[in-house]
């Protein structure tokens, strides 16, 4: 695997991929925009509290590795960043919209079941059914230029196996111990989280609109 991202690099790229699809009017992102996206409390696991300098360091590293590029001029008062990780003009990694949605959600939240992925990726791509999710995961696991995801052992109390991306190297397949008394159905939890994400993004758009009207 030629892609080797640190946890922070994966978070930054995942955020840019997400915002490119869900809030295109705010994309590319400024440093402050990337900081806000990285530290977002919805659709992030783990929740982080990165400083601007920490995010700037990751952005600089990713630009040097040609995973991002800077955008300036044409009325932009600040430098902004856009991803070149996939589907860029000269890049090698080409992904479908469904594949982008799954990879992004895995970069942002780590290992998840197909049911969780379907709900949490819904803002980026609407899967017709679970079969489409599972077939897309299998395609990512069996690509000639991959594999890009791997299926993990089933966790105690879970009906589905989890999948994890391989852009940060091999994954230690050690199922987490689950307290069955506190177990929550993954699909229901994922649907609630998807609604929280939608509310957060609508609030972000409203704040941006109000700030624009106030200028």
From Swiss-Prot:
Signal peptide: none annotated. InterPro entries: DUF480, WH-like_DNA-bd_sf, WH_DNA-bd_sf. Keywords: Acetylation. The modification N6-acetyllysine is found at residue 80. Pfam families: DUF480. The keyword Acetylation applies. Belongs to the UPF0502 family. PANTHER family: UPF0502 PROTEIN YCEH. This is UPF0502 protein YceH.
């Amino acid at each position: 695997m030629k892609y080797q991202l640190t946890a922070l690099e994966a978070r930054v790229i995942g955020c840019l991929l997400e915002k490119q699809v869900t809030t295109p009017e705010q994309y590319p992102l400024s440093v402050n925009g990337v900081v806000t996206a990285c530290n977002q409390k919805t659709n992030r696991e783990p929740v982080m509290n990165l400083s601007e300098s920490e995010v700037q360091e990751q952005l600089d590293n990713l630009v040097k590795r040609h995973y991002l590029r800077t955008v300036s001029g044409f009325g932009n008062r600040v430098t902004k960043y856009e991803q070149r990780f996939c589907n860029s003009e000269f890049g090698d990694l080409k992904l479908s919209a469904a594949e982008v949605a799954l990879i992004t959600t895995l970069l942002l939240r780590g290992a998840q079941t197909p049911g969780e992925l379907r709900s949490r990726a819904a803002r980026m791509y609407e899967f017709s059914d679970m079969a489409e999710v599972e077939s897309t995961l299998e395609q990512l696991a069996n690509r000639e230029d991959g594999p890009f995801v791997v299926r993990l052992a089933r966790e105690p109390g879970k009906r589905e196996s989890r999948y994890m991306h391989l852009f940060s190297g091999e994954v230690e397949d050690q199922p987490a111990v689950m307290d069955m008394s506190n177990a929550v159905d993954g699909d229901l939890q994922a649907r609630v989280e998807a609604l929280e994400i939608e509310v957060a993004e609508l609030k972000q758009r409203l704040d941006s609109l109000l700030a624009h009207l106030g200028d």
